[in-house]
């Protein structure tokens, strides 16, 4: 069974929207998580195929902001939770709030930690490959260990009269950059599904995991 080459990556996108607020105390940054670009075209020398991700979940346990404040002192703000997130919800899932004093921060790192919960994986993505010849094969990607999404920004300003929402968008269009058609053609199929995990098709898992950890960018909107 031919499975076409696939290019997917993770892009972490943080969107900040400001609105007026009367309080002048520490401010809450609300973290949200969503997915974008759920279908990718995959090319072969003969004809193009596609992959469509149709469902997925994440087990979020910690959100964190690390930075240097105006005194050049390293600071950390975090909040713990235990939430099973539907990554394919029509609206971004809210993870919780990180409380931070107003001010200007530099070398800012935004982090979301995922951790397995019992038999539930830290991250699951389900979908299907459609080859250039029209053959459809289900696929599941599983992360069964703790991992962290991290994105960086040079400078961030938090005022005492604004609320901020940080939306992390997982771009499913670039996650498997570096995976060749030959590797997919040789993938092990278990009960009709290509399972990509730390114990199945590990060569594919290692590439996707590296992209998941490393491929991030941050965009700020005030």
Segments the model singles out, each with a brief description of its role:
Residues 2-9:
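Sec-dependent signal peptide recognition
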Residues 15-18:
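C-terminal motif of bacterial Sec signal peptides marking the signal peptidase cleavage site
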Residues 20-222:
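A short, solvent-exposed, low-complexity linear motif enriched for acidic/polar residues
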